[in-house]
Amino acid sequence: MGNRRDLGQPRAGLCLLLAALQLLPGTQADPVDVLKALGVQGGQAGVPEGPGFCPQRTPEGDRAFRIGQASTLGIPTWELFPEGHFPENFSLLITLRGQPANQSVLLSIYDERGARQLGLALGPALGLLGDPFRPLPQQVNLTDGRWHRVAVSIDGEMVTLVADCEAQPPVLGHGPRFISIAGLTVLGTQDLGEKTFEGDIQELLISPDPQAAFQACERYLPDCDNLAPAATVAPQGEPETPRPRRKGKGKGRKKGRGRKGKGRKKNKEIWTSSPPPDSAENQTSTDIPKTETPAPNLPPTPTPLVVTSTVTTGLNATILERSLDPDSGTELGTLETKAAREDEEGDDSTMGPDFRAAEYPSRTQFQIFPGAGEKGAKGEPAVIEKGQQFEGPPGAPGPQGVVGPSGPPGPPGFPGDPGPPGPAGLPGIPGIDGIRGPPGTVIMMPFQFAGGSFKGPPVSFQQAQAQAVLQQTQLSMKGPPGPVGLTGRPGPVGLPGHPGLKGEEGAEGPQGPRGLQGPHGPPGRVGKMGRPGADGARGLPGDTGPKGDRGFDGLPGLPGEKGQRGDFGHVGQPGPPGEDGERGAEGPPGPTGQAGEPGPRGLLGPRGSPGPTGRPGVTGIDGAPGAKGNVGPPGEPGPPGQQGNHGSQGLPGPQGLIGTPGEKGPPGNPGIPGLPGSDGPLGHPGHEGPTGEKGAQGPPGSAGPPGYPGPRGVKGTSGNRGLQGEKGEKGEDGFPGFKGDVGLKGDQGKPGAPGPRGEDGPEGPKGQAGQAGEEGPPGSAGEKGKLGVPGLPGYPGRPGPKGSIGFPGPLGPIGEKGKSGKTGQPGLEGERGPPGSRGERGQPGATGQPGPKGDVGQDGAPGIPGEKGLPGLQGPPGFPGPKGPPGHQGKDGRPGHPGQRGELGFQGQTGPPGPAGVLGPQGKTGEVGPLGERGPPGPPGPPGEQGLPGLEGREGAKGELGPPGPLGKEGPAGLRGFPGPKGGPGDPGPTGLKGDKGPPGPVGANGSPGERGPLGPAGGIGLPGQSGSEGPVGPAGKKGSRGERGPPGPTGKDGIPGPLGPLGPPGAAGPSGEEGDKGDVGAPGHKGSKGDKGDAGPPGQPGIRGPAGHPGPPGADGAQGRRGPPGLFGQKGDDGVRGFVGVIGPPGLQGLPGPPGEKGEVGDVGSMGPHGAPGPRGPQGPTGSEGTPGLPGGVGQPGAVGEKGERGDAGDPGPPGAPGIPGPKGDIGEKGDSGPSGAAGPPGKKGPPGEDGAKGSVGPTGLPGDLGPPGDPGVSGIDGSPGEKGDPGDVGGPGPPGASGEPGAPGPPGKRGPSGHMGREGREGEKGAKGEPGPDGPPGRTGPMGARGPPGRVGPEGLRGIPGPVGEPGLLGAPGQMGPPGPLGPSGLPGLKGDTGPKGEKGHIGLIGLIGPPGEAGEKGDQGLPGVQGPPGPKGDPGPPGPIGSLGHPGPPGVAGPLGQKGSKGSPGSMGPRGDTGPAGPPGPPGAPAELHGLRRRRRFVPVPLPVVEGGLEEVLASLTSLSLELEQLRRPPGTAERPGLVCHELHRNHPHLPDGEYWIDPNQGCARDSFRVFCNFTAGGETCLYPDKKFEIVKLASWSKEKPGGWYSTFRRGKKFSYVDADGSPVNVVQLNFLKLLSATARQNFTYSCQNAAAWLDEATGDYSHSARFLGTNGEELSFNQTTAATVSVPQDGCRLRKGQTKTLFEFSSSRAGFLPLWDVAATDFGQTNQKFGFELGPVCFSS
């Protein structure tokens, strides 16, 4: 389960894959030369060669090979071990010189899964890599740039290192380990996180003898004064090839104008292909020497997989001259090229002092070895981890000091040794994986298959044949030039050079003592902007600046503490009807009402469920004999027929026993290429082939149907530059690029403009105190800054010093209404004053509390189209496409030689239109079109909202009292105000006295339901009243006139805030007051409660289009829209910035069928095929003649109860019924529950004054109350000067209530008084008795729609109403906000080919890839030979009845049938005419003597012609055809909405030729109305696939900071359990899903887990699965790494195991029984930290039977 590839702890070392080579010839103790097996020593791998460990060793000196990052060599391990196993105990023998570096890997052995089994890492610590190995102790650094001889002995559990002929202490290992040879052996490593060994290597041997490591310096790696060891044995009996000598004394000719090399004389020579002196071909000749080694029966030498950088010149290298040096007599040769390259400037023969170019006469490429080559490409930047320190660039030179005194002359020094190499630079970060390459070329192996009785070829011939085909196809396998890779890593540090000539004069002596201070130097250049200094001390307060702009509104303060309860106020007047309260508890069911009038007839209801089986009906009377029936069904099969003709050839029989091997036959001719075989196992990386030549352009083919999107193709070649396209939309910002290497220092640039201030860096070390600078000139005053954004509320500051007295402030607003004062002395009764004039309109009240949620407003007109939304996320992987059909068999042709590259052909003519394609997926919704022309001016809009109130006006001068105006008429009722906020529950009123029983009032007309008031506190239980008799229905009374105004009551408590009044006009600006002192910072208030949503305002006119807003937060996933029509081809956009290569995506599901292949050439005439199936159904025949009416049928059985009909439309209201008779008096009911509080009653009579309470303590500051409504104008007062606050006066005695005074003249508005103290909470009043029922109130307003009642009984069917008229289009709405990114749309049409992108950089070597998808269809082959006639196919499905055939020839007369039954006696015919008298007969025979018998009546056969039927037979056949077609669709449904299938597997079994697509199924086989549409994957055998809901298809990456790790996603605030939909986006019925699971045997589903710095399955840092995710199936079972179920999970890609960056992990679930899938929930465990995120993509679930 999952990806078990365990790489162990990440080490900074490279694995040494020890290709344990078993040697065919030789003994078991002979070591295996790995370098020779890899082709390094033979020169096939193209690895540079140079001097080795002992260059002076006789006879020819040691030679070594330079390997590095670009020399990743590999070979299949099984080729190294033909006997089939790796030695259990062995030794590693190595001679190398490594470059100074960190840990690096020299050799690695991988198994068939790509996991490393064994490796050797070199560096400061040498170690064997792999599960059972550990680092080995060593006393010497093996990567210090010097030659070392290293040997490692692995003997059982003991591992011993021998470094430079000195054995180190052994290390106890983990025991022997089995090493598989089914993988790959690589010189270096294939892991991108590790570094490949860089340096020179001379020997790399593997000996099956563990003691060989202790004899390394004597037998295999001797000292320089000893001879070289004997040649080792290569694997598989590879013949020994004499190593080419690299030494000579001749001088190469100088043919080009290249620069002359600077190497030593003995290293200037160019190696030639001359044989050794003792060779048989050591003679003067102009022929190229060849070395032929006979290998009659040996298999071919394994060719190593080489990945090198080669330079192909395209020129044939030929030896033109060979001569003998007269001095030494040795053979000398030079290489020249036929092409004239003298004029090329860069033809340089200087490649370095020790490594040269190896030139091969038979190959057209030069392999350039490292040396003093050209400057390499720019490497990728190194990533500086936190905590690392690097030396910065050198600073500017300091001032020149005074010349010190000359020191004494030192003794002459010895020539110094070469210095140690400098430290290596940090390795660059690994590059991003390159684009996945195209599928490789398929080689057709022409094996002959045994057929009939012919003898098959032997195995050796097949191998020879395969080898010949491989050689012939190598020329044609050259692929096109691949894309240029990414820039490589920085090149390795070169090898230290040989000791140079005598050095120049030595360096200066030590620095002398510090001289005197020199004179001031010239002023320096303006330095770079320094870091911002630390904040200085707080300056003195400046002068008062100009008054700034009005700041932003501050943040709302926290609510204050709760105040004490106020005194109980008097009962106020009944308020307006409140808003609808919450729905109360459901009351008891009322008494059953009388049956209403029957409603109108409803529509036909839905079909009901089948009723119970009825009783058997009465046996009917036998009916009259029926008419002659139709033709009956075919009879039973007859007896066996006669012997038939000879049949066709049968199927091949079972395979017989294997015969004895025959004698080897002569080689046959090349056979016909066979059919393509099945996909083989994963191959190893092949050689990088040379670039092939481009073929000629073929003729244009016919346009095929539009195919489904294929995999991402290789970047195309550069096309002709098109016309200038329109400017495209701005692309998204790309990823930040890596920092490049430091370039060469440029010239001094001009001083740039000062840049923006950078971010504060870390505080640096304190510098030395500098000299005091000169005082600069005072700067000019800066401009006034713009208004800043209000900052967050700061911490309370310390109280500042008291400021000076400010200017008088502006007049403050009217203060809040003060607390109720104590009862004053009774005033004198004043005279009734004249009615005052109408007061000025009051100031607008403060904004009330948010009212209850209003009704939904009308839909606004469609807004201006918003900007184009961001593109949606990538959809989940699609289903894997089906395997294409096999192509036509081609003719047997021999591959020709590759032709010359043809010129670019002309563009072909447009081909004929192709056949109609398969219905493609619906395209994406097209982009919003351009803004249309300006329309006509719209209708006048609604009046705008009232403007903001103006500034407060100054207090006007007191006007004279005007004359009393006439009494105005009673104005009309005002408009209904906005509903006020919900009032609190009222205090219980005083206990009232029980009233007398009132007379029964008249019954008023039914009023509209009133608005439901708020739920008040429960009242006291009243005395039970007597039930009154029910009075007759009386008419509604008229509204009474307004009563006289009563005497003013006592001052009440602050009332409930009234409804919000209309906004008043803006007042005049008030005078500016003095600026007051700054108050102390108040305590933060509590957070206020959230108000309800207000009513929607009327739609305003659309405003002008504003600027594009910032992208909003991701919205909730919307409902899946209908697929729109495919959009038009967009115009070509500008070239985008080249993005980084993404990570390898998860393998997609099976794709849809590909397009049909090209039409093949006409084949040869085939043999006669079998008889075809019956033809298609013919056209309908002419209508037959009308038949005679049949006899009435017998009484049928009662039919089944029909299904329940659909609910009919509501009928028209019936006429009102007659008033009912008053019902009898009911029984006394049980005591009911306490009813809801009634509306507030009228104010009671004033009670006696209560006793004065004690003075309460000052309460805490209460919450700021809402501004009350404007009060009535008060009496005119005299403006008094505000006096000081007096001491509280003594409480006076209660005075008698004064007489009601008349309202005085309106006085000027008084000033706001100080706030009074909070009073103490009053005592709770006594509970009053229940009052008498008041008179019926006026009918209330129509209330809102009540809650949905229980479903009523099904009424009779009503008449369908007339469709209403189409409504008028609404007004244009305001422009909508930019919507969230839409769901993933269907694949659009392919865009135009883009311009050639920038040249990419060379990428790193990738891992061994997975098996690629099937390649594209190859070129059209030649016509093949006619194939062998195949066996007869299975019997086809019966086709529909064919057309009526023409009248056939009359058949032979049939056999006389049996005697029929005697017919009924016919009616006597009429008397015929008398016939003529016949002739006299001959005399009869003599009679018998016995008694006479009656003569028998003989029948005679008289042929009577049958009547001809005209047209009737065709009508009968048409009816039979229609019936048979319907029966066939019932038996084998086609998967339509009317005839849904059971599951997709059944559809595939009944219709095997159906293409993949969406079909209707009905798993529970009930009514077809609950069928649903699914995707059927017939390519996979008929899988039924359901899609997940759009909400779970892509859950974006999020930190989920408020969620708990390990919890199910359904418990998250935004989460819920997974759900699945059909192809139309509708949820799948649970019952149907259960039936689908019952009908399925297996199920599979993909789940992609997106992560950021988090693990999803394996945690590679700890090596365990403690952070693995858990999954919940629909059967309630849980699946994780520790909990297994019937379902299995595999993890083919686990990118989250490293817990670094953003990546993905792909889970593939499969279940042998479909109970676990689909998935219901997921629980992530690794999140919660600040840099961790996770999301997921839920794939479709597919069931198969």
From Swiss-Prot:
Q: How is it modified after translation?
A: Prolines at the third position of the tripeptide repeating unit (G-X-Y) are hydroxylated in some or all of the chains.
**Per UniProt, what is one GO molecular function of this protein?**
collagen binding
Region Disordered, annotated ranges: 230-304, 322-362, 387-439, 476-1492
| Tissues of expression | Detected in fibroblasts (at protein level). Detected in urine (at protein level).
Where on this protein are sugars attached?
A: 102, 141, 349
Laminin G-like domain residues: 62-224
**Signal peptide, first to last residue:** 1-29
Function, in words: Type V collagen is a member of group I collagen (fibrillar forming collagen). It is a minor connective tissue component of nearly ubiquitous distribution. Type V collagen binds to DNA, heparan sulfate, thrombospondin, heparin, and insulin.
Return the protein name.
Collagen alpha-3(V) chain
Encoded by which gene? COL5A3
